[in-house]
Amino acid sequence: INWKKIFEKVKNLV
């Protein structure tokens, strides 16, 4: 699991 990818997705959601 890529934490950085999840973080990027969350940043895009915000």
UniProtKB/Swiss-Prot annotation:
The modification Valine amide is found at V14. It comes from the Eukaryota. One of its GO terms (cellular component) is extracellular region. GO terms for molecular function: toxin activity. GO terms for biological process: defense response to bacterium; innate immune response. It is found in: Secreted; Target cell membrane. Belongs to the MCD family. Mastoparan subfamily. Antimicrobial peptide. Has activity against both Gram-positive and Gram-negative bacteria (B.subtilis (MIC=11.8 uM), E.coli (MIC=7.5 uM)). Shows mast cell degranulation activity (EC(50)=15-26 uM). Has no hemolytic activity (IC(50)>100 uM). Its mast cell degranulation activity may be related to the activation of G-protein coupled receptors in mast cells as well as interaction with other proteins located in cell endosomal membranes in the mast cells. Most of synthetic analogs show a decreased antimicrobial and hemolytic activity. This is Mastoparan PDD-A. It comes from Polistes dorsalis.
